[in-house]
């Protein structure tokens, strides 16, 4: 039976251990604490804040935390008190087995200072384990011939505690044949042996039952028992004997299972069945049992499972040889496991500061790394480095810790994410290495303005565009990210023709697309200069500018405008004269037209669209000059009607037409006489023409009288000014604006001409009365006569009265005629070239406007030389009322003047008219019948 054990109070022991745990010392930069095992979670270990000189409230601010190497956290920091406390139950036997001292090393990291402090904590053992036998029942066989003093080894109890808490003593239950002897080995182990005190007699007692008790020395004392059954055997007086008391073996940890270590042999001098020996392990713990295998018949020992130096480097076991007579022999086996480089280094990222700003200073800490290799010696020595092409480097910290820092400034626009490879290699043979990837994100700052691909842009838009039409798209690129790369577009405000630029153009602030807010007119706006700004959304925002030139392209949207001949306001057509003696190529008149478009759209060509006598006249393709194509014949009609078309070269082409009436005669009186006496020879009802003329004259007379009455009232109001105008060629004063037409800020006075037409009742004669040397330039056409239209005349009542008072009539003014040098055109005295070239300089395009200004100026001062100036258009005074000048815009960039490239002058020439040859008084001219 087990002896009674005293159990002192456990609380006193725990209190003693807790007091010992508060003691610490600082030596070689390390802090030491101690704490009893099996304490509750949160038990106090030491005051970290005090030992580190930090305020407990600033622990979180300094980033103080515990870092360990892949082990379950046994300790924790109390953030309120700054104390190191247990994180859970600590079992010393699980951590350190039966090591005399159980030391746990942890590290305290102060992040803001970049420092590590080593902490060594000793786990103090308490008596929390009972001594334990591997078996509960033990059978011992003893030969009856055994002599007193014979010793029989008994199983040892195992107590995981250490020191006084470990196994201290054995006790054997009282009996008459056996006693207990305890032997202490070199390593301090206590080995119980059963000693035979008296000779056995199987016949008296064949079996004996004993109880062995194992006790420790802790407080309270703990113990356990094993029942021993002793069987007395028949005579077998020799036990197996091993040749060596101790066997030593070295083995590499990477040896495969099945590898033979050695073979042990025990000899038994007995013969027969008493000499047969069986082998088995004795004194082997549970962890060693599955690692090795012993053949009980041969004594061969082999590896049953792979060994690991890092788990255990030394094994000690006892081998027992037993014969059939229960005689035993024992020996020890010591196995040393040698390390091989079979473990790669481990890299643990304890802290990673990501993302990092791209403008961080060199030397900024990016991460803390912990490196460990489970091998020993050189196999466990590790070196770390990064790739040379990255802007980072590793710096050695304390123990096996490294700091990853920057070597230079970073640029997110070049690299936004760094995949940092940390390579750790040991010094073994062959060396083993490990690569660890660290993904570091670089945070963006607004350090790049938006940029355009080009310094300037040019865009084109057709005129007459739709409002809101897309013109051009601008795109600026900002290499920054997120809001620093969000680009908005705007157009710098300016004015164009007095209006804000924003009323013409708008831009989408998000897409950079330009839109037209108005329909552009090429004739008004040729181009726009814009300044577009691209700004990002960073803080502060950055921006850049780019210039954009927007050109308006011309479209053929303006038809040619005919400047000469102009249509009279009374609805009749203008009359042109061609003498019967005209040779082929004689210049009859010239059609002048302009086009407000430009380029090809303003190139004009002339053609004869319709003629009453085909082949008689021709029109210059580029000059617009109407010339005779052949000599005039007597059979040619007196009045020729021509329709001239003017067409530009746009797409599609636009055109305009003008109708010309050409009278084949040498003078206007002849024209009037022959018009009055003209009678178609093919008409069988020739006698009815007189009736038609009488009716027409009566109608015209009624209209004429009404017109004279109205005109008389108007003329009486302006008689004085008109009188001054005729008597003087000086400065015009007080002339109403209705008598002027503006051409480039010049007003030309419109002279009023009058004539009186007197027709007799007969069919072929008429009398013309010219009360003053001025003639109306508008005659009715033959077609109008045939349609019984009234002959329209313009009568100046005041002039007529003035001439009548003087009792005389001036001779006809010869200025109404055309000389060859006075024909319409740029060079009336020369034949035009139908294949003239297009204008190739700005001076040619300004010719028409200069000629119009010169003509208008002469008409204004009363000394018009429209027909007499060399180098002018050759417009005689007879074209004054018909070619009424309107305001002509400045088309110098797009007007083509057909014909000559000669230099224009505005010199005032003298009139070519001769002095009147007739005497005073009225001159009558009777017309002669045309004979065919």
Curated annotation (Swiss-Prot):
Topological relation to the membrane, as annotated: Single-pass type I membrane protein
Signal peptide residues on this chain, from the entry's feature table: 1-29
GO BP field: homophilic cell adhesion via plasma membrane adhesion molecules; nervous system development
Transmembrane regions: 693-713
Biased composition (Polar residues): 810-841
Keyword presence, RNA-binding: no
Domain (Cadherin) ranges: 30-133, 134-242, 243-347, 348-452, 453-562, 570-682
UniProt-listed InterPro entries: Cadherin-like_dom, Cadherin-like_sf, Cadherin_C, Cadherin_CBD, Cadherin_CS, Cadherin_N, Protocadherin/Cadherin-CA
Task performed by this protein: Potential calcium-dependent cell-adhesion protein. May be involved in the establishment and maintenance of specific neuronal connections in the brain.
Protein name per the record: Protocadherin gamma-A8
Organism per entry: Pan troglodytes
